[in-house]
Amino acid sequence: MTSTLRTVSRNFLSHIRDVIKTKRTRDRERVFVLEGTKPIVELLQSAPNQLVCIVVSPGFFERQPPEIKDLLLSSGCTVYSCPDETLAQLSHLDTSSGALAIVHQPTWDQSAILAQPRVFGLYGDMLQDPANIGTIIRTAAGLNVSALWMAPHSVDVFNPKVVRATAGSLFQLPIFSQTSIESLLSLGCTIMAADVETSADTVPIRSIQTIPARTIVAIGSESRGLSEAVLNAATLRFTIPLKPGVESLNAATAAAIALFHLSGLPTETAQS
């Protein structure tokens, strides 16, 4: 099926702005905006049904290899043409690539994930920095984490700044929002908390030799750390030792170190 290039209307441009700016619109319609030629092309190749429509600048196809133009126009997805200046105003990129897409939010089955014999997940506790969260999603996807659960009052993972920082990883990692730590405990998960404070209740991460079969690693924000509710729910609290005088790591860096180390450990059931 071949797509035709349509001129975008003012009403539809207004709708795109709403999707970009408001979580309420994204939640109601279960969509978000994806920017950049590379992530759009990758999504067309892997999951074309996720795309609602594509918006390009008038000269976009002239700058692309023939195979990219053919892929977009043969996708069956509605393709709109939008003036360069308007598209640049919509874009969250420093330099607009000349293409953005409205995309269906992915849906995941939490029960299927938790039914696996080994669960290695991540819990983000009230994380607010979009770039940090995007990097965490990208890292977790790369390290084959089972899923990411986000606490209430965390930033929306479909915020354009988060989406940009994920570098296309949003469709590779199951994500569940508005999740309390108590709900994960009730599902039989063990919480391992990354604590910013060294105390008698913490151990250095290098001392951990095994992990439970159903482990959730909890990461808090750099400024506040983990909430008391999460710390109290944790079976184990660990620290990432740093050189004296060095400030605490940001959430994305702490998550990367913790996930890399812990994901390579055997499970306790495997050694019993």
What are the residue ranges of the model-derived segments?
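A glycine-rich helix N-cap at a beta->alpha junction
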Residues: 70-92, 176
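Active-site/ligand-binding-proximal alpha/beta "capping" segment
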Residues: 192-246
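Boundary-proximal intrinsically disordered activation/regulatory segments immediately upstream
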Residues: 1-68, 154-156
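RNA substrate-binding interface of SAM-dependent RNA methyltransferases
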Residues: 74, 85, 106-201
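Amphipathic alpha-helical repeat scaffolds
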Residues: 36, 128-136, 249-254
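Structured adenosyl-cofactor binding patch, chiefly the S-adenosyl-L-methionine
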Residues: 99-101, 139-143, 152-171, 228-272
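Short, aromatic/basic amphipathic alpha-helical patches
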Residues: 63-75, 230
